[in-house]
Amino acid sequence: MKLVTFEKDGRSAVGLLNAAGTAVHPVPGCTDMQALIGIWPVLDTAAVLRGEALPLERVRLLAPIPSPAQDVICLGINYFDHAKESESVAGKGVKAPDTFPIYFSKRVDEAVAPGGDILSHNDLVADLDYEAELAVIIGKAAYNVAEADALDYVFGYTILNDVSARTIQNQHKQWYRGKSLDGFTPMGPWIVTPEEFDVRKSRKIQSRINGELRQDSTTDRMIFHVPYVIAELSQGMTLRPGTIISMGTPAGVGMGFDPPKWLHPGDVVACSIEGIGTLTNTVR
C-alpha cells in the first residue's frame, strides 16, 4: 500500500493511494504521517478505501514526512560500487567500511516535496551533488532488537535524495553541514508499506539528470543491509516511530565523473527505486 501526505485547499492531510494510483483516500481525522504511524496498527484500511476519493491530479503531494521530528540517520559509503568510486576521487576518497557502518546525521528543516525545488545556494555552493537513496521509516519503538526481528519495526520505505555540497562537506570533516542546507532533502513521492515492498529482494535504484542516466545499481549492492542497520542502531539507542534511516547511495554521483558533473539551476533530478516509484525535483 502507498501512503501519501498531500495538500488540498491549503490544508495538509494524509491518505491511502488507490491500487490504480489515480486517487487518494484521505484518512479521517489524520493530518500528518506521524499520526498515521501511531494509528496504523488499528486502522481499518478497507473502510478508508471505501470512503472519499480525491483525484490525484487535484491534490499537491508533499514529502511523506515534511518536518521530521529528528535528524535523518544516514549511512555513508554503503554500496560497494560507490565505495570504489569514492576512493578514486583524488583527495576526497573514503575507504569502504569493512566492520561497522559509517553513520552521520542530516538536518531537515523541511523536506522537499515531489516536484519541489532543490535550492542551489549559489552564494555558498559550487559543487552541488545528488544521491538517490532508499529511506526506511520506523513504525514502532525499537530498542535492543535482534537482526532477525528488525523488519518487524519498519513502517515503510520511500526515496530520499541526499543532496550534498561537496566542498562544505569536506571542509568540515564531518559531513553534517554539507548535507544539511535548506532544500537538501527531497523525499517521496510516497511511503510504500512492507507487504508491498519486500526490502530483502534486490531492487533497481537509479538517478537521471535531465534524462541522462547517472546512477544505475541494485539494492543488493549495499554493504550493510536494512535488518543489520536497524538492529545495530537499536543497541542502547531507541529508534522512535517516524525515525528515518537513509541507506546510502550507489555509484554515479556527480563527483565521481571526470570532470565532475555538478547540478545547476534548471536541472531536473529524477531518483527512482523499483517498487516505490520516481521522485522528481528541479534545481533552483
PLM feature spans:
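Structural signature of FAD isoalloxazine-binding scaffolds in flavoprotein oxidoreductases
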Residues: G91-V112, Y130, H264-G275
